[in-house]
Structure formats: structure tokens, C-alpha cells
Amino acid sequence: GDVDAAFATADVIHEATYSTHRGQHAHLETHGSIAWVDEHGRLNIRTSSQSPFICRDKIAYLFGLGLPDVRVFCERMGGGFGGKQEVLTEDLVALAAMDTGRPVQWEFTREEQFIGSTYRHPMKVSVKLGATKEGVLTAMQLRIVSNTGAYGNHGGETLYHACSECIGLYRSPNKKIDAFAVYTNTVPSGAIRGYGLTQTVYAVESALDELARALEIDPFELRQKNVVRPGDPMLSLGEEISDAEIGSYGLDECVDLVRAALARGNGVNPPDGEDWLVGSGIAYAMHDAAPPTEHRSNASIELLEDGTYQLVSGTAEFGNGTTTQHIQIAATTLGATANRFHIIQSDTDRTGYDTGAFASTGTFVAGKAVALAAEALRARILGFAAQVMDVEPGMCRMDNDGVICGEGRISLAGLWLASREHGVQLGLSRKAYGSPRSVAFNVHGFHLAVNRVSGEIQILQSVHAADAGTVINPMQLRGQVEGAVAQGVGWALYERIVLDDTGKIVNPAFRNYRIPAYADIPRTEIYFADTHDTIGPLGAKGMGECPINPVAPALANALADATGIRFRDMPFRPDLIYKPIYEKFGAGVA
């Protein structure tokens, strides 16, 4: 489109710049690796990596080794949030192990975690919106400057993602983005939950609220006039057609759920006293279910001698719940209970290739590989059981520990034994890819109170609705949303990295890098849209990253609603927002 012409004829234009700051992953478990050279001369690394195969490839390249000469594997590693994609400890323990011939272990201290790992990219995002007086968007223009630090860790990829869904969520015939990733003499930025989109969603959703107030239109109504609908083309940042699709559309239901919950007002009451100002805010977000690259995953399932199954997946488990979900997917398809499965994961020697556990692909891509393998194995088991029992395949059905064929039945252990006698392999592998990609939707709403004397913010009500397609494990998904809200609240209200004049971090510890404690996090009402995705496994979509994206802008919009002041620079700490509040409500303030 032609944004200049659209702005020239717009009834109203809103233009402002919003800035975001660094955020640490703050996972309790720091980066750590153990390396040793075995009796065959192979380099072995046990590590806390979200991407063991990528780590293996990088280590092999770095030291001039063949891929078969390097094994990388992971056990349960604790939190990652994107940061454990980086090779930060593996290279040095490998060097030391090969040099000394002895096993070497290195685990970051908390200070090393702060100064030696990566952060969320600080960004300055200038947003210009044009609209008719009825609130229909006619032009959207962004200028993004992303601080990638001293090295370009994920600089280009994060910037690419930052540019897409933030404005792809809204219809407008004219869109333009100028985006820059710049090097600075500061700690490197890298991958972290949201992957650039969190920053730009904050800017766009804040700008939309400002536009709504300028037009005197309800913020919900302005968004509803302009959001994408099923059948709309997805925004493509290049010449090619986007492979993203709306596999299910639960945005309207998410909006209705959040709007109704805020209207009910099931939160806590505002504190007593005239110094507390109360406001509400909302924000939307859309997030692709996989990155726009060839993400792929292998999975295999085999029937074992005792009638149990062995499930093998290359993806890593770091608290994202893939172990449980993959077993659930396989168990559902094979008509079995979860305790019939043994799982092997994230080992470059023992599993098929997996690009990595990042970008919400644990369910959408790796889970799809599991589903395909389970479906293929089910078909083979039923066909072989029909052959053994001498019945038509359509007469057979699976249950937890056997196959029922008409009036007869054969146990899974018996079927395994028969497979040995007939030379039939009851184990299959399948691959899945991250294209085409579906999109997930999230809506968040807050009621909050801000003290006009101190600038203190208290969250009175927190509501989140998500379109995750089929919810495979509701408890785990609620945990993902609750964790995302906690991180979003921390990033927006508490956390702040301070650099000295040389770019050195001066607060590399939790005692002076404030993350939210249990008492700081509100109880969040969580709702799921009732949809079935046409692309994901069993109708599911990824929902690991998405819930964090609307949290900060919803807080910013609620703060503006309460005070009548628009704070565009994060974080919204009392010491940083007090002055404008004092200038507006200063009467009677000491």
C-alpha cells in the first residue's frame, strides 16, 4: 500500500514512540554442562540445552569434529524460556575435557548468569496509525530499533518476528515497517519468551488504546473493527506468500470471555483511601505456532516385549510439559493409558533429529511427529492383529493392553511375540515440519489501582483468554499462562537491568534485580476458547510463548486509564512513574 497517501487522507493520526528494556530469563536453574571423552575418543556433553542437535552441530564445527564424534544429550534441565538455545558453557567444557582428558563440569553462578548470558532485546518502537473517524485503520507504520548488544545473537531473527504478528493481527490496506538491529557495547541480547514480538505488541497495543481514546471509541470496539478474520491473508514480510494460516479462530470468544470477566469484577477491592486511582486495560496478541523456517522433528514409537511402548523424541523437556503431552498424544491415538509408555528424549545418539524446543514447537511440531508415528503404528498393529486373528481389519479395535478382533482378543505382549514369529516390525518413525503454521490468539485484561502519592501499583483483577485449539492438558496449559503472566508482570512492573557508563551490569543478582515474588503475582482467571485447529496435532496449537505478549500493554493501558497519563517507557516502577503522577495529582502530596 501507500502509507503516505493514507496518512494524508486519514481523519485522525496517532504517532508516538514506546521503549522497552532488557529482561533476564531468571530461571532458577542456571546454564550448566558436563563434558568427557569416552574410551572410543568421542566427545560427550550432558547439558542444559533446549536444542541438543544444534548444539552438537556447533560444537562439531567449532572443534573440527565429525558429527558422529560428538554426542549431546539433556536430562531435565529446569527453566529455559529461550535462553538455553545459546551455546554458553558447552564449548568451554568441551575444550577443557579434550585438553585434559578428564571430565569437566561448569555451572554458571547467578552472577555469571547475569553477565554471561543473554537478555530480551531493548527496543524503541515508533508507531504511526491512521484511521477514519469511525475507527477503521487506514495505515499502520512502525520504525523499530532493536539493541542486539555486542553480538548478534538472534538479532535478525528476533527483529523479523517483531515485525510480523504485531500488525498482522489487524486489517489495514497500507502497512510499512522500517526495522534495524544495532550493535552496542553492552551485554548481548538473545532469545527469550515472545522473541521480539513482546516488545512490538506492547507498542502497537498501547498506540491502539491511545487512538481509541482520541476517537472516543471503546478500546475493545476499536480492535474488533480491525482484527483479522478467517479467510484474510496473513502478513508476509518478504516476496513469498506467508505459510501461516488461521487454523482455528477463537479470538472473538477470547474477547467475550475477558470482557465478561472484567465486567463481573471478581478481583480484590481497591485499597481504602482517596489516594488510589483505579483503571482497566486490555490488549490482544496473535502469535505464529512455529518460526518461519524449516523447523522439523522426528518421533518413533515401538511396541515392546512386555506390551508397553517406547516413545522416542528428539525434543527437550525444560518444564514446558512436552514429556507429558507427547505421551498423552500417543496414548490417545493408541487407546492406551499413559503408564504404558517409556520415553527417551533429547539425545543425539538415541533419538531422531529435532531442531529444538523453542518457538512453541514442542506440541505443534514435535507433538505432530508423535501423532503421525502413533497413527501409523496403530494402523500397522490393527492390520497385523487382523492377520493373526484371521479376521477383517475393520473388525479390530485397540484397548489399553490388547487388540479386540470380533469375538477374539490378543494381548499386546502376545502380539509382540507373534510379530517376532512373522518378521513384522511393530515400531515406526515419522517426521513433522513447522510449515504450514497456524496462529494462536491471546487476550489479557487488568483492573488495577495506582497510588497517586507513591506510584505503587496494585493489580486488582487479572484475566487471560487463549485460543490454543484443542487443550491437550488443561492443567499444564494453565501453568504456562500463569507463568507467562508472572513474567510479563515482572518485566512491566519490577525488573530493570542497570548499566554503568562502560556498559557493565551493576546489578547482577536477585537481591538488586527485582523479580516478582509470590505475593506480587495476582490470581489470574484463565479461559480457553473452544476451537479445533486444522493443522496442529489432535487440533492443538502451541501456547508456550504467546500468553506473555499482551500482559505488559494491558498493564500500560490500565495505568493510563487510572491516571490519565500515558507512560510509554517501561518498566512502570514507582520511582520511574511517580513524577508525572505527582505533577498531575500533586496537591496534598508531601
Indicate where each model-derived feature is located.
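Structural alpha/beta core scaffold segments of enzyme domains
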Residues: G1-A465, R523, Y527, L555-A556, ...
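C-terminal structured "cap/appendage" subdomains that terminate the fold
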Residues: P537-A556, A560
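N-terminal amphipathic, basic-rich helices that act as targeting or association modules
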Residues: E15-A16, R223-Q224, G445-T502, N507, ...
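Contiguous domain-boundary segments centered on the initiation and propagation of an alpha-helix
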Residues: V3, P270, V498-P516, D520
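Generic long, charged, amphipathic alpha-helical segments
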Residues: H342-Q345, P516-A540
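Short conserved micro-motifs at the rims of enzyme active sites and ligand-binding pockets
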Residues: T293-R296, V471-M475, G536-A540
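Short, conserved non-catalytic motifs in the polymerase core
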Residues: G356-F358, G362, I535-G544
